[in-house]
Amino acid sequence: MSRKQLALFEPVLLVQALTDAVKKLSPRAQWRNPVMFVVWAGSVLTTLLTLAMVTGQIAGSALFTGVISLWLWFTVLFANFAEALAEGRSKAQANSLKGVKKTAFARRLRAPRHDAQADNVPAAELRKGDIVLVKAGDIIPCDGEVIEGGASVDESAITGESAPVIRESGGDFASVTGGTRILSDWLVIACSVNPGETFLDRMIAMVEGAQRRKTPNEIALTILLIALTIVFLLATATLWPFSAWGGNAVSVTVLVALLVCLIPTTIGGLLSAIGVAGMSRMLGANVIATSGRAVEAAGDVDVLLLDKTGTITLGNRQASDFIPARGVDERALADAAQLASLADETPEGRSIVILAKQRFNLRERDMQSLHATFVPFTAQSRMSGINIDNRMIRKGSVDAIRRHVESNGGHFPADVEQNVENVARLGATPLVVVEGARVLGVIALKDIVKGGIKERFAQLRKMGIKTVMITGDNRLTAAAIAAEAGVDDFLAEATPEAKLALIRQYQAEGRLVAMTGDGTNDAPALAQADVAVAMNSGTQAAKEAGNMVDLDSNPTKLIEVVHIGKQMLMTRGSLTTFSIANDVAKYFAIIPAAFAATYPQLNALNVMGLHSPNSAILSAVIFNALIIIFLIPLALKGVSYKPLSASAMLRRNLWIYGLGGLVVPFIGIKVIDVLLTLLGLA
């Protein structure tokens, strides 16, 4: 992925964020955040009190009240700035996507074939179901499926990846995205969406959406923060009659300052920024999440369903050997295997053709001159092949070929069963070749497990995440590769129905499941999974079923998605712990300052030795505002994440953010008090 990453504090974004922070001072904007709305209300109240004192309408220190009011406004502005900066980063990413959208004309065909008559129409007039022809140099005008042709496509505007990709009709690489460019050849595309509903439009709307829906965890945390705010509001309100009864009523300004310092303003001011930044980090990883809910679910995932090919193994299985059945010549097996693979454009199919050529000098033959019919592979049949003259040649998985042989009145030889088992035990994939009802032998396909993948799975296991390998291989091959890779479990001979059933089984146990997919046959399982990452190179059905799209089309990205989700949850939890813990230091600063005149015994709580009641209150309010600014980088970047168990992460966060939340305010408030005293402002 080569898309330029935004600096944490881009100057242009800072200026825009400052402007937006001021705009967010309106009551309507503040009402969306109940904790900060209380601070906003306190700011308005103390501002009115300051004006009343300046004009002589009420008695009191206009300077002290004015300074308190100023720092309360700063508290609100800093919280607004954090949210605006996070949103600004997302909007900047959205603007880069908007640059991809270009006004273009399209060749709308009157019939679904490339030589049909075409009309030039604006791309905005295209509707779902329209057929368009795009040629080399053209911008693809709409999202759709290739129904004819094949071409090299530059998708760098969407994915950031400069290497072109092949898009062709049939299979799982027929999906194209509007805004990408054709580099060579031509494609006939059936538009799959209406204007304004394209993948690019949805990406932009998701990234820059101002009305971001809160996630379930955010809602739960907001309810907790509101409850704490109400408790502290009631507690603060009851302190005035207590102090008045003692003969020295506390001023409204001090009570407002006390309330603002007691309520969890730190997490209240940063909560929205954390959520927006989480989605922004996901986009930085070239993954588009349809909502914050999907990012949050990624952090709670405890089961990963991982495709073997491309995720656990390198994905370029190569034919390594022909093992004939008893009584069959190896050359005859190689010839039949090559014929069955002539129209098979998969890496495995091409490698079979090449191996037969290398071993026996068998040259490729033209399908048309042979008057042959190719039988493509399907997830249901799990075999492919060719019909030529009176010959019916198939290659496929052991079970699929066994069913095929038995349905044609044949018998599956015991020696072939043994050869299949031997190949599988070595971790290779056996493909069986059959002609009619006669089994000819086995092709061995070697697969290589990715380096370092076993260690990554060990880290996931420490975090309490179960890894399950999904493969179409037989159980012996799957077991050998699973053991080598270090996964916890595997699903062999997987069909779409089996994947769906496995996901439902785990969900019935109360677990959250994540998976990747790219084909139409993956759509049901993607729709069922809690976190479903569809490949951008996959079909439209897969992308619509998933709640995330990986622009790099890298199945391994699922592990990174889980890491980002967990980092967002950890950031939220860590800053909540810090916010609640640092209230303790504020108690020791404000309560003695506010009530020592009425109850002298409270002077014992002034453990920081603050200079005066006014400096103590002002120091606490200033610290309360500044800590939001200091924590903005942490909220946007996320806390340092290490793959640990839940209990180990809890202990680590309590030590760092719990203890830190207790210690930092004591130091910060004391330093501010000393500075105020030195400057003569105490």
UniProtKB/Swiss-Prot annotation:
Active site: 307
Sites where the protein binds ATP: 344, 348, 377-384, 395
One GO cellular component, as annotated: plasma membrane
Membrane spanning stretches: 34-54, 58-78, 219-239, 254-274, 588-608, 616-636, 662-682
Signal peptide: none
Reactions catalysed: K(+)(out) + ATP + H2O = K(+)(in) + ADP + phosphate + H(+)
Main location: membrane
A single MF term (Gene Ontology): P-type potassium transmembrane transporter activity
EC category: translocase
Enzyme Commission no: 7.2.2.6
Compartments where located: Cell inner membrane
Stated family: Belongs to the cation transport ATPase (P-type) (TC 3.A.3) family. Type IA subfamily.
PANTHER family per the UniProt record, alphabetical: POTASSIUM-TRANSPORTING ATPASE ATP-BINDING SUBUNIT (PTHR43743:SF1)
Free-text function comment from the UniProt entry: Part of the high-affinity ATP-driven potassium transport (or Kdp) system, which catalyzes the hydrolysis of ATP coupled with the electrogenic transport of potassium into the cytoplasm. This subunit is responsible for energy coupling to the transport system and for the release of the potassium ions to the cytoplasm.
Binding partners and assembly: The system is composed of three essential subunits: KdpA, KdpB and KdpC.
Matches recorded under NCBIfam families: ATPase_P-type (TIGR01494), kdpB (TIGR01497)
Protein name (record): Potassium-transporting ATPase ATP-binding subunit
Protein source organism: Salmonella paratyphi A (strain AKU_12601)
Gene name of this polypeptide: kdpB
